Amino acid sequence: MIPGNPSPGADLAVSKHFFSLSWFCGLLLLESKQK
């Protein structure tokens, strides 16, 4: 994501965090829809 990033592991951590965050948001939306 960031050009010239010295550590490629940071991108992986960011994408992993973003994926878990979006998944959590989707779960909350699903819960609110069921109620």
Swiss-Prot record:
Q: Tissue expression, per UniProt?
A: Expressed in gastric mucosa.
Under what name is this protein listed?
Putative gastric cancer-related gene 224 protein
Q: Provide the species name.
A: Homo sapiens
Q: Which gene encodes it?
A: GCRG224
